[in-house]
Amino acid sequence: MEKMRFPESEELPEGVKEIEVKDTFGYCTELYPDVEYAEHSGKKLHLQIMTPLVYGQDLKWPLIVYVQGSSWHKQKLFQSLPTLVRMCERGYAVAIVEHRESELAPFPAQVIDTKAAIRFLRMNGAHYGIDASKVALWGDSSGAHTALMAGITGDAEYLPEKYPQTTTEVDCIIDWFGPTDLVAASQYPSAIDHDSADSPSGVLIGGKALHDYPEDAYPAHPVVHLRRNRKTPPILIMHGGSDPLVPFNQSCILYEALKRMDKEVEFVKFKNAGHGWGGFMSETALDIVEKFITVDR
């Protein structure tokens, strides 16, 4: 978009400080809060939709669907807002997905909800200035697990009932330090419990200890849903080397599985970074994400 230029004023009253600043262009942001997209047993689920704001032009923006991590519990939906607003400034629409918490609805409810949100946005996105033909699915931590599950399974399984004629498939997935093998997570050093019935993973599979019920955890592993003969969206993995909550090995498991099946994947390790800190909020991190999203495939 070209910016409108006006003549420079020659006025400079005494005492006024005049400086030159580097011209960096970014869009303002418009928020559509609490857009209802689904309801389950009386619980309404919402999207927080943000789009770049341009007056006087009917523009459509490529879409980022974001799943906020929460250990699959009730989400703090605006936790990643500073990062996501900066993506709006770069020219993307962003929709933050509220999903059912695992205490109320175990796996695969979160995956089904995310796919319902994608379908809703494809059907109704034009109202919000969204180009729903270009969809990137992004999540952090447990949200990345949900994004991986939704993106990898696509239209094959875990489908919502509404808008059955509308695809849930996405163009790419951004996985920020997501769990990929729930059972294996307990085999590596971590600051939290990954195995007991009341651990985040245990609650996700219905309040069961993973070592007692590995067969119930198995379907919640993104890697087991990879198929050589089924299209997998390109995946960008980003993980901190010193993550205290989701072991770095979790991303290695996914990366190696994708490479074995000749799937498109990029893996970036943030040296000495933790669980979402140590560089993930930097412009460098967002540059990596944007470059991956905009690749002409």
Predicted features along the sequence, with ranges:
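Alpha/beta-hydrolase superfamily serine-hydrolase fold, recognizing
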Residues: 1-297
